[in-house]
Amino acid sequence: MAAYLLAVAILFCIQGWPSGTVQGQVRPFLDVYERSACQTRETLVSILQEHPDEISDIFRPSCVAVLRCSGCCTDESMKCTPVGKHTADIQIMRMNPRTHSSKMEVMKFMEHTACECRPRWKQGEPEGPKEPRRGGVRAKFPFD
């Protein structure tokens, strides 16, 4: 075990740490700022979350990589929002557990093509997140 850990440590010293920096090095501000900006990024999405009506079959892979908007805006009142979208055709394998059959199939997934920082709240809505009422009316469940 000690030999393995030593080999890993030597490898990291030669190649650098997985994050792209050598241990002890500080990532430059501009690099951090640019990488955190609102932009399209490859994101893994579950096929069943994107196509909830398809629960009777099994998909391989169970998730796919698509471009989605993500990142930080310079103002907390703004959020990273898609301003351009298109449909991507992605080939997957669909397996039917009842018939033990499988087939290759093309499914459609929404991809973001452009992003912008936009206000979190629309005009006419009260600004800010809705706060839960303290001591207010609580939802009643049938078994309470």
From Swiss-Prot:
Task: Read off the SUPFAM superfamilies from this record.
Answer: Cystine-knot cytokines
User: Does the keyword section mention Secreted?
Assistant: yes
InterPro entries, per the entry: Cystine-knot_cytokine, PD_growth_factor_CS, PDGF/VEGF_dom, PDGF/VEGF_growth_factor
Tell me which GO cellular component terms the UniProt record holds: extracellular space; membrane
Q: Which domain of life is it from?
A: Eukaryota
Q: Which UniProt keywords apply?
A: Disulfide bond, Growth factor, Pyrrolidone carboxylic acid, Secreted, Signal, Toxin
Q: Where is this region: Disordered?
A: 120-144
Q: Where is the signal peptide?
A: 1-24
- Which coarse location class applies to the principal site listed for this UniProt protein? secreted
One GO biological-process annotation of the entry reads: induction of positive chemotaxis
Locations listed in the record: Secreted
Kindly list the positions at which Pyrrolidone carboxylic acid occurs in this protein: 25
Q: List the disulfide bonds.
A: 38-80, 69-115, 73-117
In terms of Pfam families, this protein maps to: PDGF
Q: Which residues form the propeptide?
A: 134-144
The tissues where this chain's protein is expressed are given as:
Expressed by the venom gland.
Question: Where are the compositionally biased (Basic and acidic residues) regions?
Answer: 120-134
Task: State its role.
Answer: Snake venom VEGFs may contribute to venom dispersion and prey subjugation by inducing vascular permeability and hypotension. This protein induces angiogenesis probably through VEGF receptor (KDR/VEGFR-2) signaling, as well as drastic hypotension. The hypotension is mediated by nitric oxide, which is produced by VEGF-activated endothelium NO synthase. May also induce vascular permeability.
* PANTHER family according to UniProt: VASCULAR ENDOTHELIAL GROWTH FACTOR (PTHR12025), VASCULAR ENDOTHELIAL GROWTH FACTOR A, LONG FORM (PTHR12025:SF5)
Query: Quaternary form?
Result: Homodimer; disulfide-linked. Interacts with VEGF receptor-2 (KDR) with high affinity, but not with VEGF receptor-1 (Flt-1), VEGF receptor-3 (FLT4), and neuropilin-1 (NRP1).
Can you say what this protein is called?
Answer: Snake venom vascular endothelial growth factor toxin VR-1
Q: Which organism is it from?
A: Daboia russelii
